[in-house]
């Protein structure tokens, strides 16, 4: 019952919902005030949020495809989908999609989501590269950190804004697909592609101050400011000029 959850969060009480398989949020959860409790959704398989969530500055944690939950079954479709508005104020958003031998749809789909939070952290550990995760409209008062080491990310139509200092947006994936935008008015952003094939040269429409090819984790970064780092090494580049 969403009203019970609303009342608990409004009073500052932390709420944890745990399911062997799926969690669906189909009614708005709108906490009021400014000292809301934290909300955690922990599912053995899926989390699907189609209603709006406001936590009154509480944190929101979403964990799906959690193999530590007994009774989840095998070969389940595992996703985290948000198609609504999530407003956490000064609260943090943490999204984690675990990895297993699950077959089928296997991604974090936020393409229709509008998310406002302090920090936004997304970790997609799934391995089915045919099911890339999709980013949406994110605004963070501090930082956005996204990791999808095993798959590429779809940023088509995505808008990422982080207002913190330093590296306010940090993305690591095989590569970026589509055409999105990124803004860090008080800091910089970095996107790291780990794919060593030519796909590693795809940066989803993001343009920075520099591109560094042949990059491996731990290498010295040659450029300054916002930039693109790629494991892809195109070899020697040259251009013939006719005079």
Labelled PLM ranges:
Residues 1, 15, 71, 91-98, ...:
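Extracellular/surface-exposed low-complexity segments
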Residues 21-22, 46, 67:
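Acidic Asp/Glu-based divalent-cation binding sites
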């Amino acid at each position: 019952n969403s009203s019970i959850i609303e009342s608990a969060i409004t009073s500052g009480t932390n709420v944890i919902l745990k399911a062997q398989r799926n969690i669906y949020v189909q009614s708005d959860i709108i906490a009021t005030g400014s000292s809301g409790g934290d909300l955690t959704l922990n599912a053995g398989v899926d989390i699907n949020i189609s209603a709006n969530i406001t936590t009154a500055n509480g944190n929101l944690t979403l964990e799906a495809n959690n193999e530590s939950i007994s009774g989840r079954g095998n070969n389940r479709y595992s996703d985290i989908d948000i198609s609504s508005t999530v407003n956490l104020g000064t609260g943090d958003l943490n999204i984690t999609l675990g990895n297993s031998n699950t077959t089928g749809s296997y991604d974090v789909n936020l393409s229709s989501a509008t998310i406002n939070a302090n920090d936004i952290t997304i970790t997609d550990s799934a391995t089915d590269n045919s099911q890339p995760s999709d980013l949406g409209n994110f605004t963070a008062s501090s930082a956005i950190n996204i990791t999808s080491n095993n798959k590429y990310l779809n940023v088509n139509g995505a808008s990422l804004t982080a207002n913190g200092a330093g590296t306010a947006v940090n993305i690591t994936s095989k590569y970026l697909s589509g055409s999105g935008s990124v803004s860090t008015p008080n800091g910089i952003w970095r996107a790291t592609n780990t794919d060593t094939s030519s796909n590693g040269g795809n940066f989803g429409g993001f343009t920075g101050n520099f591109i560094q090819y042949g990059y491996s984790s731990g290498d010295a970064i040659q450029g300054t400011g916002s930039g693109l780092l790629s494991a892809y090494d195109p070899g020697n580049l040259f251009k013939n000029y006719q005079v």
